Amino acid sequence: MGRGKIVIRRIDNSTSRQVTFSKRRSGLLKKAKELSILCDAEVGVIIFSSTGKLYDYASNSSMKTIIERYNRVKEEQHQLLNHASEIKFWQREVASLQQQLQYLQECHRKLVGEELSGMNANDLQNLEDQLVTSLKGVRLKKDQLMTNEIRELNRKGQIIQKENHELQNIVDIMRKENIKLQKKVHGRTNAIEGNSSVDPISNGTTTYAPPQLQLIQLQPAPREKSIRLGLQLS
């Protein structure tokens, strides 16, 4: 009779568990060594017991070299997988966008009245309903835009009207100030003209005009006459 099938589960008995670990560990390390020799493979095995004891095997090199190679190759494979996954993702995106573009192009051609030969009465009625709905939406949007523009124009008109009113007030103030200045200037001019038109001074019945002064420029005497006068005085 053959050996019965062993159930793979944790061994409860600690002694049996330790014996089984020792036997199978030795067998695993032996198989790893045989694999590296027979197949010229680089093999690294790391085992930790339940108590934390380390057992390892490295073929033809150190365990550090095998781990470094493992990490390097694992990273390369990860990058390749990511790159391949990214390519597949974008391929699916391109296919989906192409389908959407084709559908939108067909809808556009139908909306503009092209390629209607393959449509029945129901399809045409649905297309008409879509056009009516779209037209209502367009009109509603247009009315909304026009209403907004009218409100904006009214607002700007009110601002301009307010600015004009303020400017008119400033002009009125400046006009009043100008009138005041003109009155002051005319008053001073009239006063000056009145003073200059007063009658000459009167003394009883005789009127005396104010004397007019005239500057007389002295002329130098001739040289001979000066000499004579000098002799007479001497």
From Swiss-Prot:
Tissue expression from the record: Specifically expressed in roots, mostly in lateral roots (LR) primordia, young emerging LRs, apex and base of LRs, apex of the primary root, and in the stele. Barely detectable in shoots.
Highest taxon above the source species: Eukaryota
GN (gene name): ANR1
One function term, GO molecular function aspect: protein dimerization activity
Pfam families per the UniProt record, alphabetical: K-box (PF01486), SRF-TF (PF00319)
Cited PANTHER family: SERUM RESPONSE FACTOR HOMOLOG
GO cellular component, one term: nucleus
UniProt organism field: Arabidopsis thaliana (Mouse-ear cress)
Compartment(s): Nucleus
Keywords: Developmental protein, DNA-binding, Nucleus, Transcription, Transcription regulation
CDD domains for this protein: MADS_MEF2_like (cd00265)
Ranges of residues in domain K-box: 87-177
Free-text function comment from the UniProt entry: Probable transcription factor. Required for root plasticity in response to nitrate, NO(3)(-). Promotes lateral root growth in a NRT1.1-dependent manner.
Mutant lacking the gene: phenotype: Impaired lateral root proliferation in nitrate rich root zones.
One GO BP annotation of this record: lateral root development
Subunit structure: Interacts with AGL16, AGL21 and SOC1.
Protein name, per record: MADS-box transcription factor ANR1
Induction of synthesis: Induced by nitrate in root cell culture,. In roots, seems induced by nitrogen (N) deprivation (e.g. nitrate free medium) but rapidly repressed by N re-supply (e.g. nitrate, glutamine and ammonium). Slight repression in shoots during nitrogen (N) deprivation.
InterPro entries: MADS-box/MEF2_TF, MEF2-like_N, TF_Kbox, TF_MADSbox, TF_MADSbox_sf
Residue span(s) of domain MADS-box: 1-61
